[in-house]
Amino acid sequence: MNAERLMQVLLAPVVTEKATFVAEKHQQIAFRVVADATKPEIKAAVELLFKVQVEAVQVLNRKGKVKRFGRFVGRRRNERKAYVSLKEGQEIDFAEVK
């Protein structure tokens, strides 16, 4: 795993009602990640970018919804999310990240 690949693994933090609830209750942070990212890559990327220790990583693949606009049928893209559990005493402050 080279540093260049790790910099491309995380796409964005997920900021939703569910992600905020999980972050507060279980000390987990949700990220959108590239489709071919593995758990070890996600762990290494979070540790490299945010300088924290990761305890565990859970990933899920979400299928894109089929949407209709008038008589045209389209589809939203598929998405892969990662829920990252941090070790005790660790936290990520997105306001401080540059």
From Swiss-Prot:
Record flagged with keyword Kinase: no
GO BP terms: translation
Function: One of the early assembly proteins it binds 23S rRNA. One of the proteins that surrounds the polypeptide exit tunnel on the outside of the ribosome. Forms the main docking site for trigger factor binding to the ribosome.
Keywords: Ribonucleoprotein, Ribosomal protein, RNA-binding, rRNA-binding
NCBIfam families tied to this protein: PRK05738.1-3 (NF004359), PRK05738.2-4 (NF004363)
PANTHER family given in the database record: 60S RIBOSOMAL PROTEIN L23A
Subunit text: Part of the 50S ribosomal subunit. Contacts protein L29, and trigger factor when it is bound to the ribosome.
UniProt source species: Bordetella avium (strain 197N)
Source species taxonomy: Bacteria, Pseudomonadati, Pseudomonadota, Betaproteobacteria, Burkholderiales
GO molecular function: rRNA binding; structural constituent of ribosome
One GO cellular component term: ribonucleoprotein complex
Pfam family membership, one: Ribosomal_L23
Protein name (database record): Large ribosomal subunit protein uL23
Family in the record: Belongs to the universal ribosomal protein uL23 family.
